[in-house]
Amino acid sequence: ALVTLLKGFKHVGLPISTGASYGLAALFGLLTMGIGALMVARIQLDPAADREFHFANVEKVFAVLMMITACSMAFAHGSNDVANAIGPVAAVVSVVQSGGNVTQQSGLPLWIILIGAVGIVFGLAVLGHKVMATVGSGITALTPSHGFAATLAAAGTVVLASGTGLPISTTHTLVGAVLGVGLARGIAAINLQIVRTI
């Protein structure tokens, strides 16, 4: 939320002060925490159950938390990949609008951002299912707790890179996070044939 408030809104003409951005980000964090706590509180836990059932209860909690990190990953994907996709178009439009002068910084028209967003959505709709299947189950078996760890690490890395202006690949970052989760259980937990093709 803080990256959006500090960096994103200024491109659409809604500059927010730094202090207000931190306050709104803290409120958003508290709201997300409250929603997560309500969802986790609804899960039925049985303290008299056996050990395997306790692991299932933990996975139920992480299934709820996974929804939050999946939203974070979607945000990170949009904040990073749309910028990577529209960068060359924005540069060309800037040069054309300035009469051939190359400037250090220029405004970004909203229609360019929308074209980038539509392109990302179209790409996900057409080829996204193959990437999701490979990352979600092809590299290693993922439980909700493993998926939570991988998406939290990948989303945090991508948002940090987007906020600092580093162009990185969201997909490669997520694949690296999934590999890390798989390696935590040993090299045998990873499908090396799939990793070679990636």
List the model feature ranges, each with a label.
Residues 1-198:
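Multi-pass alpha-helical transmembrane bundle typical of ion/small-solute transporters
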